[in-house]
Swiss-Prot record:
Primary localization class, coarse: cytoplasm
Gene Ontology BP annotations: cellular response to starvation
Lineage: Bacteria, Pseudomonadati, Pseudomonadota, Gammaproteobacteria, Enterobacterales
Family: Belongs to the IraP family.
Protein name, per record: Anti-adapter protein IraP
One Pfam family linked to the record: Anti-adapt_IraP
Presence of the UniProt keyword Coiled coil in the record: yes
Protein's organism: Escherichia coli (strain SMS-3-5 / SECEC)
Gene Ontology CC annotation, any one: cytoplasm
Cell compartment(s), UniProt: Cytoplasm
Length: 86
């Protein structure tokens, strides 16, 4: 029983580490996108936003992906493009 608990705790720690790494990657990408948007002319920003939104609209997610997840992604992309980090 102790071995099972120790193994589960070890796996949990691994998952937590993976989660932290993914969070760091997302934060880094947010910073990069924000910096890029801030250094673009307004019309270039709008063109990029339109292209990204168009690409998202055309993508048909796999049936195994819940609609809520797809909507979450679309909303987050929209938020990042229209209201970048402060």
């Amino acid at each position: 029983m102790k071995n099972l608990i120790a193994e589960l705790l070890f796996k949990l720690a691994q998952k937590e580490e993976e989660s932290k790494e993914l969070c760091a990657q997302v934060e880094a990408l947010e910073i990069i996108v924000t910096a890029m948007l801030r250094n673009m002319a307004q019309n270039d920003q709008q063109r990029l936003i339109d292209q990204v939104e168009g690409a998202l609209y055309e993508v048909k997610p796999d049936a195994s992906i819940p609609d809520d997840d797809t909507e979450l992604l679309r909303n987050y992309v929209k938020k990042l493009l229209k209201h970048p980090r402060q």
